[in-house]
Amino acid sequence: MEEKRRKYSISSDNSDTTDGHVTSTSASRCSKLPSSTKSGWPRQNEKKPSEVFRTDLITAMKIPDSYQLSPDDYYILADPWRQEWEKGVQVPAGAEAIPEPVVRLLPPLKGPPTQMSPDSPTLGEGAHPDWPGGSRYDLDEIDAYWLELLNSELKEMEKPELDELTLERVLEELETLCHQNMAQAIETQEGLGIEYDEDVVCDVCRSPEGEDGNEMVFCDKCNVCVHQACYGILKVPTGSWLCRTCALGVQPKCLLCPKRGGALKPTRSGTKWVHVSCALWIPEVSIGCPEKMEPITKISHIPASRWALSCSLCKECTGTCIQCSMPSCITAFHVTCAFDRGLEMRTILADNDEVKFKSLCQEHSDGGPRSEPTSEPVEPSQAVEDLEKVTLRKQRLQQLEENFYELVEPAEVAERLDLAEALVDFIYQYWKLKRRANANQPLLTPKTDEVDNLAQQEQDVLYRRLKLFTHLRQDLERVRNLCYMVTRRERTKHTICKLQEQIFHLQMKLIEQDLCREPSGRRSKGKKNDSKRKGREGPKGSSPEKKEKVKAGPESVLGQLGLSTSFPIDGTFFNSWLAQSVQITAEDMAMSEWSLNSGHREDPAPGLLSEELLQDEETLLSFMRDPSLRPGDPARKARGRTRLPAKKKPSPLQDGPSARTTPDKQPKKAWAQDGKGTQGPPMRKPPRRTSSHLPSSPAAGDCPVPATLESPPPLASEILDKTAPMASDLNVQVPGPTVSPKPLGRLRPPREMKVSRKSPGARSDAGTGLPSAVAERPKVSLHFDTEADGYFSDEEMSDSEVEAEDSGVQRASREAGAEEVVRMGVLAS
């Protein structure tokens, strides 16, 4: 099977290999390595260089991409190819210069016999198989040198030699037995005797008695004595025991008193320490877990007044103090100071299993006050006794350390390890000398399993607390992100709502402007047409196309006005007096094209109503000036109400024959009616219709719209002649009667029409000599301009040609009376 080769992708960018390399690669794959080296060695032998570079090895490693190999036979080089790799691999010039290693086989090592007598067991038989694992002790240079000396002496004595493993194992066993026996000696009366002293009391409850299940335990480092229940020791360890501060190697100061040392427990934070006795006697402080008597909690519940108390015994304000339990005594003192001074500190068990603490000051302790001189000599004696006890303990400990070898028996070690006692005695003497040279310090560190466990527990607590804080921080970060996302969402919603509100206000503003703005450019010149043709074709304008347009008219007009098709026009728009004087039929609306889509109208609804109301008022005014008609004539009312269709633009279906007259002729008609010296061609009188052609109910004005939709438009010829709109410019030249009419599009008059209405009246007053009432007529229409922008003055109104010929002279005599009637009508409206 071929060896795995490294596959390299050959390209012109990262390699200089050519097709020649490919052929050499394929050839090198078929050839073996020795055959490839034969061609190179003769040249090397000729030149005899010290080193050579072989390039065939790198060439043999590269294969082209097109070469068919299984994926297990090559590797893909992921690094970019370097040009210096083409130089080759440095190899020695002569293979004969390479030194050849010399290897020889050694016989298997047999364990030397260690028995001193023929019947003693050998080391290989009983010692090595039973030793568990390796040894904790490692030989140093001194041990190795001593072992050589020992083996030389044993060889001279014709005794078996001692190996290194046996020496290490014996030294470890000696150290283990010495540590165990010394710990046992410290715990017994032989070592110190302080545990069995009658004066030893619990550091928490100050009781010298122990019970079954509540033994008194001593710390092996600080020698503090506590009960199991008082310090929260769930199980008494078999070996040594250390308090929490000694296990952590710290010497903290109590948070509630100035004393250092003693039975301390940490707070919840783990950074501050409090005496268990202080936590029990100060009423505000509590203990989290009574079984373990930790952690100390509710430190913050201590009032400031207690922190401000000064101890009467040590004269310090450090920490917090308790006060005498007598009602009239306020003496303050620290808990530990009271214990050290021997004050009366009682623990009372109530009937409900409640523990009560009662403390008394120096004055109330033992039933009476203590004199200062008697208390002063007592203090030095107690201090001396304590010092003597400590000194005695240290002396005994030092003596035990100096006589360490007395705690170990060589025979016991030989029996444990199943070795010869004489050999173990040699090692025992060497161990004793080496340990004395080390200042009686052990050669091996003792197995402090309990200390390690306590430290590990503390580390585990700190690690769990750190992990808890980490998770808490992560949770807070998630909460912050959620709050930020909610805030951003609400801001976005607020922005969108505000934007929609602004859009709504802008739309309403535009709608209000469209409703209140006067349409500009709506009034234009109407189409010119003969009055006779309009009179003949006006009543016949109801073609089938117009009827279809009449049906669709109301819906389109109401839809363009923003109203539904079921909107009650008669009850909403026609309740006022001005609206009742105008009859709006569906046919008129359809034929006059109230189109909102035309480019000239921006404001359909105000233009529709205001212009029609204005036209109705002007029509009424013209009727008042006409002497041939009476105010009570129903024909005049009907004609006044039916002037609306003449104001509209011709529908697209109406051609030239039905086109209305152009507004250019209307100023001439107005001058013909009002002025006496007006010159113009005589107009023919069209046939006049009677009141029989009017709608059936002309006087009401509040009839519903469907009734007017079915009735045909009355007096079309006369209405078209009388109500044709005037142009804004009154100085337009009027063509002769021979000129053919031109159909022109109508435009609404702009807002400036209000100002232009007054000028024709002024000119007529100055040029023709009319009464002042005629000149004041535009003022009447100006009153309507503030409310309805589509009102016109009297000069813009036109009457039929017959009225211009018959009542031209009589009109001037009735101007003053007509003015007063119009004013009364305006006030009534």
Curated annotation (Swiss-Prot):
Q: What is known of its domains?
A: The first PHD domain is essential for its E3 ubiquitin ligase activity.
| Pathway connected to this protein | Protein modification; protein ubiquitination
- Please give the InterPro entries that the UniProt record associates with this protein: Enhancer_polycomb-like_N (IPR019542), EPHD (IPR034732), Histone_Mod_Regulator (IPR050701), JADE2_ePHD (IPR039549), JADE2_PHD (IPR039548), Zinc_finger_PHD-type_CS (IPR019786), Znf_FYVE_PHD (IPR011011), Znf_PHD (IPR001965)
Give the modified residues of type N6-acetyllysine: 32, 38, 298
Q: Which residues carry this modification: Phosphoserine?
A: 9, 15, 117
Please list the residue ranges that the record marks as compositionally biased, kind Basic and acidic residues.
536-552, 776-786
Q: Indicate what this protein is called per its UniProt record.
A: E3 ubiquitin-protein ligase Jade-2
Give the Basic residues compositional bias ranges.
522-535, 637-650
Q: Zinc finger regions (C2HC pre-PHD-type), where?
A: 251-285
> Which family does the similarity line name?
Belongs to the JADE family.
Q: Where is the composition biased (Acidic residues)?
A: 792-806
**UniProt GO cellular component terms:** histone acetyltransferase complex; nucleoplasm
- According to its UniProt record, this protein's enzyme class is transferase
| Null allele phenotype | Strongly decreased level of KDM1A polyubiquitination resulting in increased level of KDM1A protein. Decelerated emergence of neural progenitors and mature neurons. Embryonic stem cells grow in aggregates with smoother-edged, rounder-shaped cell clones and fail to organize in rosettes with surrounding cells exhibiting neuronal morphology with extensive arborization. Decreased expression of neural markers.
Q: Where does the record place the region Disordered? A: 1-52, 362-383, 517-555, 622-817
Give the EC number(s) listed in the UniProt record: 2.3.2.27
Gene expressing this chain:
Jade2
Q: State the protein's purpose.
A: Scaffold subunit of some HBO1 complexes, which have a histone H4 acetyltransferase activity. Acts as a E3 ubiquitin-protein ligase mediating the ubiquitination and subsequent proteasomal degradation of target protein histone demethylase KDM1A. Also acts as a ubiquitin ligase E3 toward itself. Positive regulator of neurogenesis.
Query: What PANTHER family does this protein map onto?
Result: E3 UBIQUITIN-PROTEIN LIGASE JADE-2, PHD FINGER PROTEINS
**Do you know which SUPFAM superfamilies this protein is assigned to?**
FYVE/PHD zinc finger (SSF57903)
**What binding partners and quaternary form does the record give?**
Component of the HBO1 complex composed at least of ING4 or ING5, MYST2/HBO1, MEAF6, and one of JADE1, JADE2 and JADE3. Interacts (via C-terminus) with KDM1A (via AOD/Tower domain).
Q: Where is there biased composition of kind Polar residues?
A: 9-39
SMART domains (UniProt xref): PHD (SM00249)
Q: GO molecular function of the protein, one example?
A: histone H4K12 acetyltransferase activity
- Kindly state which reaction or reactions the protein catalyses: S-ubiquitinyl-[E2 ubiquitin-conjugating enzyme]-L-cysteine + [acceptor protein]-L-lysine = [E2 ubiquitin-conjugating enzyme]-L-cysteine + N(6)-ubiquitinyl-[acceptor protein]-L-lysine
Q: Where are the zinc fingers (PHD-type)?
A: 199-249, 309-365
